[in-house]
Regions:
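Walker A/P-loop NTP-binding motif of AAA+ ATPase domains
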Residues: 1-179, 183, 195
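C-terminal engagement/docking regions of AAA+ P-loop ATPases
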Residues: 3-11, 16, 28-29, 121, ...
Length: 245
């Protein structure tokens, strides 16, 4: 709604930082944003940009932003953005010493460009590793914490990934939801795959139909532990409060 945005002086572009534990769907969230505003989605990894050849990384950044600005509105998404914008006092690479200022210059004022509004979305599991300059106003003005899935999200994830599997009706679904507290979305997917593969092998060995039982999930929980430690969650909380991490 560009007319309403202009009326209320709402910027069409700008910078958004998605941060939080790994495996929580930050990339999918960025894609959903692009789909919601019907904008081209440019996604690159730091490996696509960085180069050991002098000047190549800078050229790659320039090409990326030029390509995005050819559109009426575009979304650029870079995962593991801390690899592109690390704290300069923590790296000695001459490439990064040149690249970080260039990235900061590209991000400067993107929320004010009404000719070619650009939405830059960066995702990271380590927001405290970002250069302090990128966290100042005018770059990543919006910081969105993407947490571990809550009870409702875990219920939806489990229902989606178990719906076509031969799960014994006796398995207590709420028990599964409760047992996966502290699991990331990726952890839950890994758990289901591990349990399903185990029962598949059993069905092949016994040459008959098998059901995924509660004991199979118990065995899965024994080997598929939550990947995010409580100490990591506390670091995100400190970052959100603006405290030193």
């Amino acid at each position: 709604h560009p007319e309403q945005a202009a009326r209320f002086r709402v910027s069409l572009g700008g910078g958004i930082l998605l941060y939080g534990p790994p495996g929580t769907g930050k990339t999918m969230l960025a894609r959903a944003v692009a789909g919601e505003i019907d904008a081209p989605f440019f996604t690159v990894s730091p490996a696509d940009i960085l180069s050991r050849w002098v000047g190549d990384a800078e050229k790659n950044i320039d090409k990326l932003f030029r390509a995005a600005r050819k559109h009426r509105l575009a979304v650029i998404f870079i995962d593991e953005i801390e690899a592109m914008l690390p704290r300069r006092d923590a790296v000695e690479s001459p490439v990064m010493q040149r690249l970080v200022p260039q990235m900061l210059a590209e991000l400067e004022g993107i929320d004010k460009d009404r000719q070619h509004p650009l939405l830059f979305v960066g995702a990271t599991n380590k927001p405290w590793a970002l250069d302090e300059a990128v966290l100042r106003p005018g770059r990543f003005d919006d910081r969105v914490y993407v947490p571990l899935p809550d009870e409702a999200a875990r219920r939806a994830l489990l229902a989606m990934h178990l719906q076509k599997l031969p799960v014994d009706p006796a398995v207590d679904f709420q028990w599964l939801v409760d047992r996966t507290a502290g699991y990331s979305g990726a952890d839950i997917v890994g758990l289901v795959r591990t349990v399903s593969a185990s029962v598949f092998r059993r069905a092949i060995q016994r040459d008959d139909e098998q059901w995924i039982e509660a004991s199979d999930f118990e065995a899965g929980f024994a080997v598929c532990l939550p990947s995010v430690l409580p100490a990591s969650l506390e670091k995100y909380a400190r970052f959100a409060r603006g405290e030193e991490v």
